[in-house]
Design a protein with these regions (language model features):
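Low-complexity, Ser/Thr/Pro-rich intrinsically disordered segments found in N-terminal tails, propeptides
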Residues: 1-10
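Short, surface-exposed beta-strand/loop micro-motifs that present aromatic residues
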Residues: 9-18, 235-242
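Zn2+-dependent metallopeptidase catalytic core
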Residues: 13-30, 36-143
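Short, polar loop/linker segments at the starts of domains and inter-domain junctions
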Residues: 44-53, 173-177, 262-273
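Short linear interaction motif-like sites in intrinsically disordered regions of transcription factors
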Residues: 45, 84, 104, 176, ...
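Metzincin-family zinc-dependent endopeptidase catalytic domain
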Residues: 92-236
């Protein structure tokens, strides 16, 4: 059975490309994102599940902006203004760049023969080898495809522009449905549990991660959600971002590193592109480059 080249679903699309021409096999998640420049002067509460489109406004210049309060995840109001056309165009370009930079070139999936009843054929295995001196693997990537306002998308995200000429009420807490003009930049975190560590994260990349959900869930969870569920209610919000330094450093924690948790959307989709219910192992690109896994006996036999 051959690999499925493309899969289109309501959570995200994906494309598999076999190795060839000196490049490795590749699995790309294609997420269609509708970014909406939020109109702060219009009354609106984010309601992403009811099909309504948020109010939008783009001004030609600063004299034409509208102003008003926009609430963050905690329900706190922040003074905001509408976007200016050139600002909005620049934000969209940088959004795509930063999300892809944050996620790409980290996740590799290596095939194994654990699933003996549904293992890859020799011809399929060959499609995962771009150089016999390297173990077979699939490089994973995300491709953000921006769609027009009101267009069909996998993710609908409002983007508020903070009014930086007005005093701000602390830090606007974004979430997967609502970002700000600051979300394409790195955010730094410091925690007393790890006083010598600075955690850095591209906010928009983290929030897009929540959209890499399964068909039966509304969002992709933070890295330590299962552990957080075992903690007292008051501690859960903090704990879900990671109760160890390693977990906290993950993309779906407070950092930028892809772990086996972040690899799950690609892993579950690769199962559908192939016909193995098991047989894929996550390896981080940095670990692969530092200590290349051993080439399997099967690969040595296919490429003597």
């Amino acid at each position: 059975m051959a690999f499925r080249t493309a899969i289109a679903q309501t959570n995200y699309d994906s494309v598999f490309e076999p190795a060839g021409g000196g490049r490795p096999a590749k699995l790309t998640i294609r997420l269609k994102v509708a970014l909406n420049p939020l109109d702060p002067a219009a009354p609106w509460v984010a309601q992403p599940q009811n099909g309504q489109q948020p109010p939008t406004h783009i001004a030609n210049n600063l004299a034409g902006v509208r102003k008003g309060p926009v609430v963050d995840y905690n329900g706190s109001p922040f003074p905001c203004r509408s976007w200016i056309a050139n600002e909005w165009n620049a934000f969209k370009i940088r959004f795509k760049q930063m999300v892809e930079v944050g996620w790409n070139n980290q996740i590799l999936l290596l095939p194994t023969d654990d699933d003996q009843d549904h293992r890859l054929t020799d011809e399929e295995f060959r499609q995962l080898v771009f150089n016999p001196r390297y173990p077979a693997y699939v490089a994973c990537a995300i491709d953000i495809q921006l769609v027009a306002i009101g267009g069909v998308s996998h993710a609908l995200i409002e983007v508020a522009h903070l009014d930086h000429s007005s005093p701000q009420n602390g830090k606007f807490r974004v979430w997967m449905n609502r970002l700000t003009d600051e979300s394409n930049e790195f955010t730094t975190f410091h925690w007393q549990q790890w006083p010598d560590t600075t955690f850095r994260q591209i906010t928009s990349a983290h929030e897009v991660g929540h959209w890499l959900r399964s068909l039966v869930s509304t969002y992709f969870e933070h890295i330590d959600a299962a552990y957080a569920a075992t903690q007292p209610p008051a501690a859960r919000a903090h704990a879900q971002y990671g109760h160890t330094e390693t977990l906290r450093s993950a993309m779906m924690g407070d950092g930028s590193v892809a772990t086996d948790h972040e690899a799950m959307p690609w892993l579950t989709r690769m199962v559908r592109h192939a016909h193995m219910s098991l047989g894929w192992t996550f390896v981080h690109r940095a670990n692969f480059d530092a200590a290349m896994p051993e080439i399997s006996a099967r690969q040595r036999a296919l490429f003597p």
